[in-house]
Amino acid sequence: MLAKRIIPCLDVRDGQVVKGVQFRNHEIIGDIVPLAKRYADEGADELVFYDITASSDGRVVDKSWVSRVAEVIDIPFCVAGGIRSIDDAAKILSFGADKISINSPALADPTLITRLADRFGVQCIVVGIDTWFDAETGKYHVNQYTGDESRTRVTQWETLDWVQEVQKRGAGEIVLNMMNQDGVRNGYDLEQLKKVRDVCHVPLIASGGAGTMEHFLEAFRDTDVDGALAASVFHKQIINIGELKAYLEAQGVEIRIC
């Protein structure tokens, strides 16, 4: 059995780490490099770096920040933000990223997933999915350009359909960003994760809702996700990564202890 992964996330806008609630009303958290180093030192299994407005702004993630973070960490490093071509991806990887993640650009051009997977290998290609539960229809829909609330839009894709589509096209991993739970810290959407797990045959990462150590345990134990991503509980030092991993190990979760 592969060890479960704990993954802190740096949402970056205008050169600073920010955090919102349900992808809105972002507050400034702090400087990028010190936070990245802190999480690596605490025992994170991987670090995710999202330039949250790159896609909606029509630009690519700032490569200088990628290189600065890569210099201070020694854990796998996944980068997202406006990657629209093989050339974009190659540059990000050359600046120190280990994996690239695409989200809105994949929705705009699904063939991008296959082209990137063919060029760099499926193990290098992560697809992020921003999913919103519509209480009126009882359905989960994929949203696009969520880093800028003024430009966010609902796509024609239902979440389960898109999960299956991106796998067919070569996604090596999926990060499910559950927008309703984002920043609320009331727990992951276990029901949605179970539904996605049933149709997801590549590594699946839960994102959105962690508020306690028990929430991580529930995600691993009840939905069999491969990793759990979180931001605010780590940024605000509500949970220490090392202590979280010790707790999970004590509960019988296969986890890497530094």
Swiss-Prot record:
Pfam families: His_biosynth (PF00977). The active site is at D11, D130. GO terms for cellular component: cytoplasm. The keyword Cytoplasm applies. Keywords: Amino-acid biosynthesis, Cytoplasm, Histidine biosynthesis, Lyase. It is found in: Cytoplasm. Pathway: Amino-acid biosynthesis; L-histidine biosynthesis; L-histidine from 5-phospho-alpha-D-ribose 1-diphosphate: step 5/9. One of its GO terms (biological process) is L-histidine biosynthetic process. It catalyses: 5-[(5-phospho-1-deoxy-D-ribulos-1-ylimino)methylamino]-1-(5-phospho-beta-D-ribosyl)imidazole-4-carboxamide + L-glutamine = D-erythro-1-(imidazol-4-yl)glycerol 3-phosphate + 5-amino-1-(5-phospho-beta-D-ribosyl)imidazole-4-carboxamide + L-glutamate + H(+). Its EC number is 4.3.2.10. Its main location: cytoplasm. The keyword Ion transport does not apply. GO terms for molecular function: imidazoleglycerol-phosphate synthase activity; lyase activity. It comes from the Bacteria. IGPS catalyzes the conversion of PRFAR and glutamine to IGP, AICAR and glutamate. The HisF subunit catalyzes the cyclization activity that produces IGP and AICAR from PRFAR using the ammonia provided by the HisH subunit. PANTHER family: IMIDAZOLE GLYCEROL PHOSPHATE SYNTHASE HISHF (PTHR21235:SF2), IMIDAZOLE GLYCEROL PHOSPHATE SYNTHASE SUBUNIT HISF/H IGP SYNTHASE SUBUNIT HISF/H (PTHR21235). Belongs to the HisA/HisF family. Heterodimer of HisH and HisF. This is Imidazole glycerol phosphate synthase subunit HisF.
